[in-house]
Amino acid sequence: MKRRMTRRRKKVCAFCADKNHKEIDYKDVNKLKRYVSERGKILPRRITGNCAKHQRALTVAVKRARHIALMPYTLD
C-alpha cells in the first residue's frame, strides 16, 4: 500500500492575523477557553497555530486566570 503525501497548511496565529487585538487579557475568559482542552490543559502551539510570542502570553494569561479563580485548574 502506498501512502499519499499530503501537505498540511501551517496554521496562522489568530492574534497576529487580527490587527485590532491589543493584548491577551487574563480577564477575557471566553477567549482563553478556546486555547484550553476539555481536561483543562493549555493546548500546544502545533494545535492552536499560535506564534511563540503569543503562545507565551496566552500561557501567562491562563495561569493568571487560574490563580485568581476565573478558570479552573482541572476539569473532572
Curated annotation (Swiss-Prot):
Keyword match Ribosomal protein: yes
Keyword RNA-binding on entry: yes
Keywords: Ribonucleoprotein, Ribosomal protein, RNA-binding, rRNA-binding
InterPro entries: Ribosomal_bS18 (IPR001648), Ribosomal_bS18_CS (IPR018275), Ribosomal_bS18_sf (IPR036870)
Any single GO CC term annotated in Swiss-Prot or TrEMBL for this entry: cytosolic small ribosomal subunit
GO MF entry, a single one: small ribosomal subunit rRNA binding
A Pfam family of this chain: Ribosomal_S18
Highest taxon listed in the record's lineage: Bacteria
An individual GO BP term: translation
Subunit structure: Part of the 30S ribosomal subunit. Forms a tight heterodimer with protein bS6.
UniProt xrefs under NCBIfam families: S18 (TIGR00165)
Purpose: Binds as a heterodimer with protein bS6 to the central domain of the 16S rRNA, where it helps stabilize the platform of the 30S subunit.
PANTHER family (UniProt xref): 30S RIBOSOMAL PROTEIN S18, SMALL RIBOSOMAL SUBUNIT PROTEIN BS18M
Family classification: Belongs to the bacterial ribosomal protein bS18 family.
Protein name (record): Small ribosomal subunit protein bS18
